[in-house]
Amino acid sequence: MGQKVNPKGLRVGIIRDWEGRWFADKNYLELLHEDLKVRKFVKTKLQQAGVPKVEIERAANRVKVSIYAAKPGIVIGRGGTEVENLRKQLEAMTGKQVAVNIVEVKKPELDAQLVAESVAQQLEKRVSFRRAMKQTVQRTMRQGGQGIKISCSGRLGGAEIARTEWYSEGKVPLHTLRADIDYGFAEANTTYGKIGVKVWIYKGEVLPAKKVAQVEGGK
């Protein structure tokens, strides 16, 4: 089962938290569509900043949007002008009071979504898919990843018949629920058609905090 399902969704509520944190009774559908619109808008507008994920929190008529970015300087802009413009656009889109929070991604090489997008960009620039995969795997392992697997599917190298090729290093235990595995997907639009890129990165195990037994007598 771990081989088939999205590793992020499988671990939500176990070692991962939700990316949308709010509760809705009757207007769930509208808020869900609003979330999708906000995420799509932010990803498109801040393409150069490297945005792997957008977290959304809601309370009454307020929305808090946390944008994770590899290049936070591009998001903030000179003197915070860009982030203020973004906030106003999001307020106009949602009709609610919006607070924007920027979080820096310290190691982009260990973020599966950014890695997948990087490989897709290289494929669009006609870099050999084997070379792109191999170099990316080496970079991730150098940055402290414990395992990585990259899969490319489509008309690789302009071949007549589409196929899937993958490259991996280290270990990626997809069945282990306490394993911190990040997953990312991106598409490369080449002259021969789309090439799908999937990336799994294993960062180590997340062990539950041990409960310290309280000693009687205040010791």
Swiss-Prot record:
GO MF, any single term: rRNA binding
Highest taxon of the lineage: Bacteria
Pfam families: KH_2, Ribosomal_S3_C
Function field: Binds the lower part of the 30S subunit head. Binds mRNA in the 70S ribosome, positioning it for translation.
A GO cellular component entry from the record: cytosolic small ribosomal subunit
CDD domains xrefs: KH-II_30S_S3
Similarity section: Belongs to the universal ribosomal protein uS3 family.
Name the UniProt record assigns to this protein: Small ribosomal subunit protein uS3
Biological-process GO terms, alphabetical: translation
Subunit-structure text: Part of the 30S ribosomal subunit. Forms a tight complex with proteins S10 and S14.
Listed HAMAP family: Ribosomal_uS3_B (MF_01309_B)
